[in-house]
């Protein structure tokens, strides 16, 4: 059952506004968790690697659970999922204020808040796409900046709340603010279906029998059977209440014996239903095999395989600065009075700018989005390697701005995926890539923290991060170079291109 045509405006702009504030409220604290990270280090006295798991889980769980989030939104709709997820995020933040140890935060802040954010992201993107068609890119760009603006504001807000109310009070207030997501969700009016104004149950006779395993003649015979044909008689009586415990003997005459036999039509129906279940299970298994086959075919595309490696390495190396920059400044002995603007705030506002500008740049026909994405990866890797050389607030602020701007390449990642696999395989491929992006988000900060615990300095940690991102960028660059297209041209050409890779590599 399809939805009516996207209005490309009207109530859709209300959807854009509430989706913007939904992402602002849910992602503000998890993305600005670097401010809380420093406080948790002092409060619980755990290592940097272990403490970093809290923030990395909050960002990674939502991406790891993206298939489940999509299933919930498609089953229940954006409005119920948004309201439910608002309770999850608010409850997780408030529960974190009661955390007795770091392991409690793994659950309350990392898993509960992270899962709520993943559900909210899927819900806001889904309903925005339903309301917009020709202006979909603009609408998605506007709502995606909500998380970046939230990072910018929440970094300063959480620091101020900690000064006035302490860490526990800060988490309680931020959790209370997250309850405004419920109001945003209530305004997410779903589009009516194209064939009926309200959802109605379809009459059974109107449903096509796709899994029929017996012919119409047999069904008609079963439907026209009388009550007596099935082995029952009008003379049969129910036992009175007083006769329940009394033993009865079976009738010895042939007519009575017929009643004790299981009727043949009933046996036939049991066999038919058993076969039906077997056939349905076989179809489900075939769907699963087809899914695995499609996944395997995606990885036969060299560009997609390189993109998979690049996004994994990018998130392992590129995500830690958004979580750890505040502690990096403290470890480099930058004075508190010099931190006029939190480094996390600079990172956040430049991420919003990067999303908008890179998204606009990707719309130009003369720009190859694959090469643009590779350029952001390589420059990000170089900026990460430069962090150990920055020992002052000014240089750290400049690098935070550069890294934030380049992290805005998330806005062009769907373009890159589409160009790699085609629009027909976008949903499947994007889900796989987001899963591994979540894996990288979850692993990156703890790895950097472990390097610090091992060496007592962030220098080697950020050299490692920069190397990961550079490696991913160069692997993707080698996969899309035109020379691969020329190598393919020397081989015997089939009647039609069998992979999308040839098209991508030759499109310079």
Curated annotation (Swiss-Prot):
GO terms for biological process: carboxylic acid transmembrane transport; carnitine transmembrane transport; creatine transmembrane transport; urate metabolic process. It is found in: Cell membrane. It holds the Pfam family MFS_1. Expressed in the liver and kidneys. In the liver localizes on the sinusoidal membrane of the hepatocytes. The keyword Phosphoprotein does not apply. It catalyses: creatine(in) = creatine(out); (R)-carnitine(in) = (R)-carnitine(out). Keywords: Cell membrane, Membrane, Transmembrane, Transmembrane helix. Residues 242-263 are annotated as: Disordered. It is a multi-pass membrane protein. The chain crosses the membrane at residues 13-33, 53-73, 80-100, 102-122, 137-157, 164-184, 303-323, 341-361, 370-390, 396-416, 431-451, 460-480. PROSITE patterns: MFS. It comes from the Eukaryota. GO terms for molecular function: carnitine transmembrane transporter activity; creatine transmembrane transporter activity; monocarboxylic acid transmembrane transporter activity. GO terms for cellular component: plasma membrane. Extracellular pH-and Na(+)-sensitive low-affinity creatine transporter. Also functions as a pH-independent carnitine efflux transporter. PANTHER family: MONOCARBOXYLATE TRANSPORTER, MONOCARBOXYLATE TRANSPORTER 9. Belongs to the major facilitator superfamily. Monocarboxylate porter (TC 2.A.1.13) family. This is Monocarboxylate transporter 9. It comes from Rattus norvegicus (Rat). The lineage of its organism: Eukaryota, Metazoa, Chordata, Craniata, Vertebrata. The gene is Slc16a9.
């Amino acid at each position: 059952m399809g939805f009516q045509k996207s209005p490309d405006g009207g109530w859709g702009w209300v959807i854009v506004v509430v989706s913007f504030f939904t992402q602002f409220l849910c992602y503000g604290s998890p993305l600005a968790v670097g401010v809380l990270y420093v406080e948790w280090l002092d409060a619980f006295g755990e290592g940097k690697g272990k403490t970093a798991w809290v923030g990395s889980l909050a960002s990674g769980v939502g991406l790891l659970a993206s298939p489940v989030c999509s299933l919930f939104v498609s089953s229940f709709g954006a409005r119920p999922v948004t309201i439910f997820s608002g309770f999850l995020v608010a409850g997780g933040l408030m529960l974190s204020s009661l955390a007795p140890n770091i392991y409690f935060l793994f659950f309350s802040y990392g898993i509960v808040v992270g899962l709520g954010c993943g559900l909210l992201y899927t819900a806001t993107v889904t309903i925005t796409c339903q309301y917009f068609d020709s202006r979909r890119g603009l609408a998605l760009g506007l709502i995606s900046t909500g998380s970046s603006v939230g990072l910018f504001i929440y970094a300063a807000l959480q620091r101020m709340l900690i000064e006035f109310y302490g860490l526990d009070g800060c988490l309680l207030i931020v959790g209370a603010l997250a309850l405004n997501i419920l109001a945003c969700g209530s305004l997410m009016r779903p589009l009516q279906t194209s064939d009926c104004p309200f959802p109605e149950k379809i009459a059974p006779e109107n449903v096509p029998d796709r899994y029929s395993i017996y012919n119409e003649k047999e069904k008609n015979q079963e439907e026209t059977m009388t009550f007596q044909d099935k082995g029952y008689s009008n003379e049969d009586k129910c036992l009175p209440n007083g006769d329940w415990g009394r033993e009865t003997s079976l009738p010895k005459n042939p007519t009575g014996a017929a009643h004790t036999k299981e009727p043949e039509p009933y046996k036939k129906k049991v066999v038919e239903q058993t076969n039906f279940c077997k056939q349905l299970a076989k179809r489900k298994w075939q769907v699963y095999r087809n899914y695995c086959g499609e996944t395997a075919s995606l990885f036969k595309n060299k560009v997609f395989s390189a993109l998979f490696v690049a996004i994994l390495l990018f998130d392992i190396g590129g995500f830690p600065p958004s979580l750890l920059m505040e502690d990096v400044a403290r470890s480099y002995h930058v004075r508190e009075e010099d931190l006029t603007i939190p480094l996390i705030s600079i990172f956040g506002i430049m991420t919003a700018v990067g999303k908008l500008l890179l998204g606009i740049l990707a719309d130009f026909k003369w720009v190859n989005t694959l090469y643009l994405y590779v350029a952001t990866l390589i420059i990000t890797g170089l900026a990460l390697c430069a962090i150990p050389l920055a020992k002052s607030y000014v240089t750290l602020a400049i690098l935070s701005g550069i890294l934030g701007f380049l992290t805005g390449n998330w806005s062009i990642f769907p373009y890159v995926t589409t160009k790699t696999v085609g629009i027909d395989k976008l949903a499947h491929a994007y889900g796989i890539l987001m899963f591994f992006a979540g894996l990288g988000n979850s692993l990156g900060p703890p790895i950097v923290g472990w390097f610090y615990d091992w060496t007592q300095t962030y220098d080697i940690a950020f050299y490692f991060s920069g190397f990961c991102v550079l490696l991913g960028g160069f692997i993707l660059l080698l996969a899309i170079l035109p020379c691969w297209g020329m190598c393919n041209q020397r081989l015997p050409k089939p009647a039609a291109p069998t992979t999308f890779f040839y098209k991508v590599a030759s499109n310079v």
